[in-house]
């Protein structure tokens, strides 16, 4: 029961409890429960390979609820597009998607980066009440910074 992985998860749970971070508490508790009941070999590969997509899908559903309820329609969209804030948000959405594209390349070429990204995400979630938005954005930002460093040092 006290493997290095379990000890690490228990440590993360303690950090989450101290930081009062509900998302991390739930995530670590679910992982420990899956391990405890012995389904880790079956479930972890699926969670690891598809979990980010599931999470993005759930977030997308939550964001689209106002459209589904009729709270936001074409009229509101048209009115919003008259605001420069909406154009900034549109540009930010495009930029983030393009940055994430480079993250896929970096994670494929250097899987060790994943460990640092995961640890950075855990620290931000646990200690600074950050939100785990996925490693692709982090890897994309890391890729851009690495390219800039390489450009200026070579």
Swiss-Prot record:
The chain crosses the membrane at residues 8-28, 54-74, 87-107, 117-137. It comes from the Bacteria. It holds the Pfam family DUF441. InterPro entries: UPF0756_TM. It is found in: Cell membrane. GO terms for cellular component: plasma membrane. Keywords: Cell membrane, Membrane, Transmembrane, Transmembrane helix. The keyword Cell membrane applies. The keyword DNA-binding does not apply. It is a multi-pass membrane protein. Belongs to the UPF0756 family. This is UPF0756 membrane protein BLi03063/BL00400. The lineage of its organism: Bacteria, Bacillati, Bacillota, Bacilli, Bacillales.
């Amino acid at each position: 029961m006290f493997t290095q992985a379990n000890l690490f998860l228990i440590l993360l749970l303690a950090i989450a409890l101290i930081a009062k971070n509900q998302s991390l508490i739930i995530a670590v508790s679910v992982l420990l429960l899956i391990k405890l009941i012995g389904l880790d070999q079956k479930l972890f590969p699926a969670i690891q390979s598809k979990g980010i997509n599931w999470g993005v899908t759930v977030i997308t559903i939550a964001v689209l609820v106002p459209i589904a309820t009729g709270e936001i329609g074409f009229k509101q969209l048209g009115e919003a597009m008259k605001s420069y804030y909406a154009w900034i948000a549109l540009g930010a959405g495009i930029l983030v998607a393009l940055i994430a594209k480079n993250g896929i390349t970096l994670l494929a070429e250097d899987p060790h980066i994943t460990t640092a990204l995961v640890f950075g995400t855990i620290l931000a979630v646990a200690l600074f009440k950050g939100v785990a938005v996925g490693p692709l954005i982090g890897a994309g930002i890391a890729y851009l910074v690495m390219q800039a460093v390489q450009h200026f040092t070579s």
